[in-house]
Amino acid sequence: MTNTQKNKIKKIAEHFRNSLKFPKVLSKSGAELLFDNDLFTALFRERFGVYSENKEAFNAAFQAVTEGVGQEITKINSVVSSALLPLLVFYKLYIPKEGISIILKVGGETKKFTRAFFEVRNKVIGRPSCVDVALVSSDGNTILFLESKLTEMFEDATTEKEYGSSYKDLYMQSGIRSALNNRRIAIVEEATNLILKSEQPQYLEGIKQSISHLIGLVKGPQDTQDQSEYINAYNHAERLIYTPILYDPTHILSKHDNEYSNYHSLYSDVIGTHGNAILDAIKKWVKKSNGKKIVIEQSPLTYQKLTQENPDWLDERVKTFYGL
């Protein structure tokens, strides 16, 4: 679009706004808005009891979550939004402050994390993989990558998933094939595209997503200006840790939690148990090793465990809402 065309659009927007004498509100890119973004975030801050001293961090984190390539702005208004949950849990770390940190037992040790990035983009094939949260340790040596799950395993348990042909060669390598076979997930060899088949309905997308995130950890961040701080953190870190973080609904569903427990064990059986073999296959496939130590957690982290290890971390209304 040329500058002349941009100016024409700008003139139309000004005409609309002036017709009802709306105040002038601009986005970061200079486009005219009907409402200040803070009006929208204020509703979330009020509903979940975000204190005024955390307003700046919440607003900035909200923007990072909702303006990502995942189009989370269309999803965050759901009561069971998978975008909202990590935002409410980790937003305080988006703008680092002295004395603000959480403690987690990951990678075989207890680490303090003082910085959070949302929707970080790493190179995979074509489109990047977007990891929900990346937590940076206080010493900058470790980044913990978290893929948040709330109800996805209920919505997308299936016996078959099809993906593009560009992934086929990677998945045909013995390290990944044996990992999938551990849960009787087969690859349709005669197909051009990658087709995963399972005897029983399972959350196959969660496994494919984890493997894509691991590719991204090996290949590194997508080089864009809006990720400069994350890129600096990635380059500085010596160790990268990956795990899903799940919301455990068993206190709500009691005995009817098969999908949750199935995915918890699915991740452990495929990714957790065979993590090193999967990483070796990825490094061979991309013909690259970034020199960083990549650690894959054996079992998923849960929001319940995070809360137990950090009992005073969450805002009270957030704890009540999610039963944490």
Where are the language model's segments positioned?
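Short, solvent-exposed loop/turn segments at secondary-structure junctions
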Residues: F118-I125, K149-M153, P221, Y247-I252
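Acidic, metal/cofactor-coordinating or nucleic-acid-engaging core segments within structured domains
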Residues: E155-T243
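Short acidic loop-to-beta-strand element that houses the catalytic metal-binding Asp/Glu
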Residues: P128-V136
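A short catalytic or substrate-binding loop motif that flags glycine-/basic-rich loops and adjacent residues
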Residues: S81-A83, V124-P128
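Non-catalytic C-terminal interaction segments of nucleic acid-processing enzymes
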Residues: I211, I215-L324
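Active-site beta-strand-loop-beta-strand hairpin of nuclease catalytic cores
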Residues: L135-F145
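Nuclease-adjacent, charged terminal/linker segments that flank catalytic cores
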Residues: M1-E119, L324
